[in-house]
Regions:
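N-terminal, active-site-proximal structural segment of metallo-dependent hydrolase catalytic domains
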Residues: 1-82, 150-151
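A Trp-anchored, charged/polar loop motif used as the substrate-binding/catalytic surface
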Residues: 25-31, 111-121, 151-158
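Structured beta-strand-rich core segments of catalytic domains in phosphoester-bond hydrolases
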Residues: 45-128
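Active-site flanking residues adjacent to catalytic metal/cofactor-binding acidic residues
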Residues: 49, 134, 173-174
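Active-site environment of divalent metal-dependent phosphoester hydrolases
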Residues: 53-55, 79-81, 139-140, 176-180
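Metal-dependent phosphoester/phosphodiester hydrolase catalytic core
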Residues: 124-155, 163
């Protein structure tokens, strides 16, 4: 099982139904207001780096501010129950294929597996667009662990681009590092 007990009422964060509902409302208000000044419909998709499970995502997209969104999520290997997901507006972006590509262990470490790479392929404004949602290891891990994740994303990108040279590819998420 997943080690996410700290988010229960008796856990260290003392989550209650009231706290949960408040979090959903606040998150949905922020997400619902993103880019509205530039794109009245809002973003076509939003990458999520720390989703606990599909139930939480279902509850989130039921909120009035983002009820037009659907989501893609796969249960990943992270022992804390933290996964990547993609929220998307089906009127703007139609999903044609999705999968979770598991990360390979860094130097054989199978205990501290990262969340994997969520790949979502679809159509946006008549063009094929592929999104890779990431959540790389934290800064508590050594830099080579994040470099290892970056190399895996590059290999995924190279493979996708070999099959379609005109592919529009977006890599997003929490890379737990500063831009270079």
């Amino acid at each position: 099982g997943k080690n996410d007990y700290e988010f229960l009422p008796n856990g260290s964060y003392q989550w209650t139904a009231k706290k949960y509902e408040s979090k959903l409302q606040n998150l949905s208000k922020v997400l619902g207001s993103l880019s509205r000044d530039l794109v009245p419909e809002g973003p076509a998709f939003i990458g999520v780096a720390e989703a606990e499970n599909s139930r939480v995502l279902e509850d989130l997209v039921k909120q009035p501010a983002i009820s037009n969104y659907e989501f893609v999520h796969y249960e990943g290997p992270d022992r804390r129950g933290i996964d990547c997901a993609l929220l998307y507006d089906p009127k703007q972006f139609s999903v044609t294929h999705s999968k979770l590509v598991l990360s390979t262990p860094f130097e054989g470490d199978t205990v501290h597996l990262t969340r994997g790479f969520l790949i979502v392929d679809g159509q946006l404004a008549g063009e094929r667009v592929c999104v890779i949602v990431n959540h790389w290891p934290s800064r508590g891990a050594k830099s080579p662990v994040r470099v290892h994740a970056a190399r895996q994303v590059k290999a995924l990108k190279d493979s996708l681009m070999r099959s379609d040279k005109k592919l529009k590819l977006i890599v997003m998420g929490d890379m737990n590092d500063d831009p270079m």
